[in-house]
Amino acid sequence: MAPRNSLEAGAHVVLFNRDIKPGGLAEYGIFPTKHKMKQGLRKQFRAILAHPRLDYYGNCSIGEKGALTLADVQTLGFDALVVAAGAQGTRQLGIPGEDAIGVMHAKDVVYHYNHLPPFSQRALPLGKRVAIVGMGNVMIDIAHFLLRLRACVEEVVVVARRGPAERKYDAKEYRYIEPFVDQQALQHEILRLRPRLEAVGQDVAVLMAEMTGNGQATRPPDCPGRLTFRFLASPHRMLTDAAGRVRGLAVEENRLVRQQGDVSARGTGEYVELPVDTVIFAIGDRVDESLGLPYARGQFVTNPHPDAADPLVSAYQTYDPILSGTNFASGA
């Protein structure tokens, strides 16, 4: 944590936070029932906020659209400005219909069930058949929420660009959704993809055992929904009705390509329509450019006039050199 490191270095820290409560994703990004993890992180934040050399200002957004701009903060007399805001922008795929009614992004759901304003005040209009695009831990949390706490959801369809071997979620997290997995449908899906999986040397029997387990997970009696997978499928466009609401998701069938040990997906030009009425993208976020920092995708922004005496000049050097002093500001 930037504030703790600065305090340990003897600095006086002023912490600006967009939210009222401190914690960021530690507070608003973790599934609500993971009490032990949340309490442990909250204890750390309480200790930091209690430090006599830290001043905390919550409900104060920083950026071009915020209460203060970065330029404003730089005029307040600090010797250094540390931005620890993470990626708060929404990542878009740029496909047709991405702004249709019924299309959401992970933060819309995660911040809603974690009670972060203004997301918690917004309605969450879910249909009966929900597609979640993505195969990471966030997908697990959203599927868990939909199937365990939203009785209106009859089916969650996980749409993955690559195959079961490339799943990104932690194995221990899978136990939260395993009781809802339609094991027969999962086996059928893996067998459907056998030629494409074996073409890159993947063992279907091993994948089947890893994904299906013993099939003995107990489904909660009051949760009738099921979870299915659609692997090797890339979102192509939203299908909408006359009112602009989602009625389906068109996906492109993919094949796997192995290059230098890495497996990637390539489109086949074949398309399939999935009948869903809600689509949630859990594909990560992007930097919010309105924060006011120099931004370039896939690279660091470095000092245009680097210090040649810096031994790490070829690896990294800050854009705005830090001056000597003991007063630091941190944005979160």
Residue ranges and their predicted role:
Residues F78-A80, A84-R91, N254, V276-E289:
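Glycine-/small-residue-rich beta->alpha transition segments that form the dinucleotide
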Residues A2, E8-V14, Y57:
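Structural/interface elements that position substrates and couple domains in central-metabolism enzymes
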Residues G89-R150, V301-D320:
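Glycine-rich dinucleotide-binding loop and its adjacent helix/turn
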Residues G10-R18, P22, Y28-G29, M37-K38, ...:
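Dinucleotide-binding/catalytic capping subdomain of oxidoreductase cores
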Residues A84-A85, D99, A106, V133, ...:
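Short, well-ordered coil/turn residues at beta-beta hairpins
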